[in-house]
A protein has these predicted regions:
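N-terminal low-complexity, Pro/Thr/Ser-rich intrinsically disordered segments
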Residues: 17-35
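Sec/Tat-exported extracytoplasmic proteins
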Residues: 47, 59-62, 70, 108-112, ...
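PTP/DSP superfamily signal
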Residues: 16-21, 105, 109-113, 135-211, ...
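A phosphate-binding catalytic loop at a beta-strand-loop-alpha-helix junction
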Residues: 114-131
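Second-shell loop/turn segments in exported
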Residues: 43-44, 63-64, 68, 90-94, ...
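Bacterial Sec-dependent signal peptides at the C-terminal "C-region" and cleavage site
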Residues: 5-22
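Sequence context surrounding c-type heme c attachment/ligation sites in exported
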Residues: 143, 147, 151, 182-298
Length: 298
C-alpha cells in the first residue's frame, strides 16, 4: 500500500472514530456572554444572554436554537428579533428530571444548527444540561462531559447534577418524546418554596436530636440539602413583582439574611460544630416563619 493510499485510509477511518473535545482551550470568554464553554462542535453553554447584543452575537455565529434550563421566562422577544428560537426546559439544582433529559435529546436530534444552552449564571445547571446534550448527540464521552462541567465551575456540592450526568443513558427508540415549548409557565417563588418545604421536611427529622447528632450522622446528605436551600432562596428572590414596591427592600433583605444564615450553617458543619449548626437551622426556621407571617399569612 503506497503512502498516499495509506494516508487516505487513515483519514477516512479517523473521521468515523469519536473525536474528543479539545481540552487545550480551557475557557472561552465572549464579550456578550459569560461562561462560554464548548461541549463539542455546535454545542455551547453559558449564562443568560443579557440583551440585544448577546442575541445578535449568537445569530451571527450561526446559532438558531437556544435552550434555557433556568426557571425565569426566556426573553423571547429579543430572540425572535434575531431569528432565534427558544426551548424552555426548567430544571432544579438537585438533578436532571427525566423529562428534561428527553427534551435535551429531542433538541439535539432535531437541530441542524449550533445550539446554545444557558441557565442563570452559567456555572451549574447549564453545563449539566449541555453535558447531557453532548452525550445525547455523541459529541462527548461521559468523561469528557464531566471535564467540561469542571471547567465551567459546576460545584461538587450539587451532587445531584453530577449523578445525573454519570448515570445518563440514551432513551430507547420507542420512548415518547416531550413537546418542546418556548416558554413554560411557572413561578420561581412558588417552585422554590415547594422545593424548600420538601428539603426541610427531611432536615427536620435529622434536627430532632438536641446535640446535632442527626446532622453529624448524615453529614454529606445534610450539607447537600443546605446547598439546595441556599439556591432556593436565591431563585425565590429573583421573582419580580411579588411584593409592593414599598416592601421590596425588606423582602430582599430577608432573603439575604436567610442566605447568610445557610452559609453559617454550612461553615459550622465544615468545622464539625454540630450543635452550632443545629442552632443555626432553628434560627433559619424562625426567620422563615416571620417572613411567612408578614408576606404569606396576612
Amino acid at each position: 500500500m503506497n503512502l498516499v493510499v495509506l494516508w487516505c485510509w487513515m483519514a477516512c477511518a479517523s473521521s468515523c472514530v469519536h473525536q474528543p473535545v479539545n481540552l487545550e482551550h480551557e475557557r472561552h470568554m465572549v464579550k456578550w456572554l459569560s461562561q462560554w464553554i464548548s461541549f463539542g462542535e455546535g454545542l455551547t453553554s453559558g449564562g443568560t444572554p443579557p440583551g440585544e447584543p448577546a442575541f445578535a452575537f449568537l445569530a451571527g455565529e450561526g446559532y438558531r436554537t437556544i435552550v434555557s434550563v433556568d426557571g425565569a421566562r426566556p426573553d423571547l422577544e429579543s430572540a425572535h428579533r434575531h431569528g432565534l428560537s427558544y426551548v424552555h426546559l426548567p430544571m432544579s439544582y438537585d438533578g436532571v428530571d427525566p423529562s428534561v433529559a428527553l427534551g435535551l435529546f429531542r433538541v439535539m436530534q432535531q437541530s441542524d444548527s449550533p445550539v446554545f444552552i444557558h441557565c442563570h449564571q452559567g456555572h451549574h445547571r447549564g453545563p449539566t444540561a449541555a453535558a447531557i446534550a453532548s452525550m445525547a448527540k455523541g459529541l462527548c464521552s461521559q468523561e469528557e462531559a464531566l471535564s467540561r462541567m469542571e471547567l465551567a465551575g459546576t460545584s461538587p456540592a450539587y451532587s445531584g447534577l453530577w449523578r445525573s450526568v454519570r448515570s445518563y443513558q440514551l432513551p430507547e427508540k420507542e420512548t415518547p418524546m416531550p413537546i418542546l415549548r418556548e416558554a413554560v409557565a411557572g413561578n420561581l417563588l412558588i417552585e422554590a418554596m415547594v422545593t424548600l418545604d420538601r428539603v426541610c421536611e427531611w432536615l427536620d427529622e435529622r434536627a430532632s436530636f438536641s446535640d446535632g447528632a442527626g446532622f453529624q450522622s448524615h453529614e454529606a446528605a445534610c450539607m447537600e440539602r443546605f446547598v439546595l436551600i441556599r439556591e432556593g432562596f436565591m431563585e425565590a428572590a429573583r421573582e419580580p413583582d411579588v411584593v409592593l414596591p414599598s416592601s421590596q427592600a425588606d423582602w430582599e433583605e430577608r432573603f439575604h439574611r436567610a442566605q447568610d444564615a445557610v452559609e453559617e450553617i454550612l461553615q459550622s458543619m465544615r468545622d464539625r460544630k454540630w450543635e452550632v449548626a443545629l442552632s443555626g437551622y432553628k434560627e433559619l426556621k424562625r426567620q422563615c416563619s416571620q417572613c411567612h407571617q408578614k408576606y404569606r399569612d396576612e
